[in-house]
């Protein structure tokens, strides 16, 4: 089994290193990269207006990293007042590391549906919620918080940019190297991988690979695109992906 990891740097390379240490054949093929978001310069002032009744949500490690770097450039700290939430354990740890605060997060899955089930988020009418995220992505969290009566705003902390590849060249490379398992961690990357691959390689290689994804939503999308051998990891971090690949 040869494994192709499509998640971005540095998590993709880290997973490849761990797999190789276990004797697996694995390759990194990041489909997207990240650059600073256009709303970052407004972050410090927006955070400063929040009170102890308000909420801050971090939706990825990348949002935390770019936000913290901007606060450092501005000579500001993470404010003590608001309550902090994260999409999952890995993002919560990243936010705790840079802020020192307790971060609330769902214990089961790193998805918006699980985050929204937290008891602290059931009665939030009149509270302000600032969501730190990248460009695009799902709107479920913001829409649900708004429906529950919160005043929701967003800060685009980073932008996802597609990395440019020659699709035919890459497909031939991975087919020749005997890749039989693909690891994909977002719908955007799944669509990118499918569209990047020429039709012949799509039919004779890509869609015949075993596909590891991180949610049932992604599995459904994969089935619509033509994959049949699909496995869903129990979480989105590298530990969960490593377990699923054993």
Swiss-Prot record:
S-S bridge residues: none
Catalysed transformations (reactions): hydroxymethylbilane = uroporphyrinogen III + H2O
Keyword annotations: Lyase, Porphyrin biosynthesis
Biological-process GO terms, alphabetical: protoporphyrinogen IX biosynthetic process; uroporphyrinogen III biosynthetic process
SUPFAM superfamilies on file: HemD-like (SSF69618)
MF annotations from Gene Ontology: uroporphyrinogen-III synthase activity
Domain of life: Bacteria
Enzyme Commission number, as recorded: 4.2.1.75
Pfam families (UniProt xref): HEM4
Xref: InterPro entries: 4pyrrol_syn_uPrphyn_synt_sf, 4pyrrol_synth_uPrphyn_synth, UROS/Hem4
EC class name: lyase
Metabolic or biological pathway: Porphyrin-containing compound metabolism; protoporphyrin-IX biosynthesis; coproporphyrinogen-III from 5-aminolevulinate: step 3/4
Family designation: Belongs to the uroporphyrinogen-III synthase family.
Function, in words: Catalyzes cyclization of the linear tetrapyrrole, hydroxymethylbilane, to the macrocyclic uroporphyrinogen III.
UniProt subunit comment: Monomer.
Name of the protein described by the UniProt record: Uroporphyrinogen-III synthase
Protein species of origin: Salmonella typhimurium (strain LT2 / SGSC1412 / ATCC 700720)
């Amino acid at each position: 089994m040869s494994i192709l990891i499509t998640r971005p740097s540095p998590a993709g390379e880290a997973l490849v290193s761990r797999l190789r240490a276990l004797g697996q054949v694995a390759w990194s093929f990041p489909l997207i990269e990240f650059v600073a978001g256009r709303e970052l310069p407004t972050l410090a002032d927006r955070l400063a207006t929040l009170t102890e009744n308000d909420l801050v949500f971090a939706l990825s490690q990348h949002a935390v990293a770019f936000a913290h770097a901007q606060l450092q450039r501005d000579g500001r700290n993470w404010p003590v007042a608001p309550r902090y939430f994260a999409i999952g354990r890995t993002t919560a740890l990243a936010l705790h590391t840079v802020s020192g605060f307790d971060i609330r997060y769902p214990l089961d899955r790193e998805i918006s549906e699980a985050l929204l089930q937290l008891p602290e988020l059931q009665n939030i009418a009149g509270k302000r919620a600032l969501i730190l995220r990248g460009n695009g992505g799902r709107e479920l969290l913001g829409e649900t918080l708004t429906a529950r009566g919160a005043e929701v705003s967003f800060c685009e902390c980073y932008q996802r940019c597609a990395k440019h590849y020659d699709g035919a060249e890459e497909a031939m490379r991975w087919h020749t190297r005997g890749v039989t398992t693909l690891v994909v961690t977002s719908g955007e990357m799944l669509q990118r991988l499918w569209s990047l691959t020429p039709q012949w390689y799509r039919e004779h290689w890509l869609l015949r690979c075993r596909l590891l994804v991180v949610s049932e939503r992604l599995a459904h999308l994969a089935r619509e695109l033509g994959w049949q051998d699909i496995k869903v990891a129990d979480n989105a971090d590298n530990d969960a992906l490593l377990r699923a690949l054993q």
